[in-house]
């Protein structure tokens, strides 16, 4: 009789062990799936990234190069989508090169992979509807974006990430750093961002 009880208990233990193993396998699979899911880091704000003299130099160099901003590679002008002026500064400029090198310390990219410094001027009413900085089929896809505030003292102009429910207001000299792709280097809707109208 005691032997039979022992056998019954053994069967129960085996059943419990099988169930526990089953649960552990399920938990392991869930963790694996979560690990393999695409991830996207939140944008980072770095305060006082540029000095006042650097900001003044960049503004001075860009002033005579400003042109109406266009949309993407199409070179189209549509102020309903984007209203600003753009200038591009060469990396040969010592100040520009120093700023770019400082940015690159937060990435794994060499300066040869970096674009020229894009300077944007937003007047009252200037804005940029939510958009992506990376495009399908682009071999030279932008991987990281640094938005540097060259001045402040205005209302509006926050950088928003609608799919992250995040909004960032920068002071002069601050930089906003974010990835344009997910951890698998695919375009992600989480990187969608825009500039609110300047008042």
Spans of features found by a protein language model:
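Fe(II)/2-oxoglutarate oxygenase catalytic core
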Residues: 15-199
């Amino acid at each position: 009789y005691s032997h039979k009880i022992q056998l019954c208990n053994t069967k129960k233990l085996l059943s419990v062990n099988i169930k526990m193993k089953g649960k552990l396998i399920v938990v392991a699979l869930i963790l694996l799936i979560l690990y393999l899911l695409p991830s996207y880091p939140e944008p980072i704000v770095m305060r006082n990234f540029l000095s006042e003299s650097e900001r003044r130099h960049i503004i001075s160099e860009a002033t005579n190069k400003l042109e109406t901003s266009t949309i993407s590679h199409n070179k189209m002008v549509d102020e309903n989508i984007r209203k600003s002026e753009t200038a591009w500064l060469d990396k040969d400029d010592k100040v520009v090169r120093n700023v770019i090198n400082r940015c690159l310390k937060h990435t794994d990219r060499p300066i040869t992979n970096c674009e020229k410094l894009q300077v944007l001027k937003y007047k009252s009413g200037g804005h940029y509807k939510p958009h992506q900085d990376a495009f399908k089929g682009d071999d030279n896809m932008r991987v990281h974006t640094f938005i540097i505030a060259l001045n402040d003292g205005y209302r509006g102009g926050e950088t928003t990430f609608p799919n992250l429910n995040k909004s960032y207001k920068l002071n002069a000299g601050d930089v906003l750093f974010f990835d344009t792709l997910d951890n698998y280097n695919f375009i992600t809707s989480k990187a969608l961002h825009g500039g609110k109208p300047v008042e």
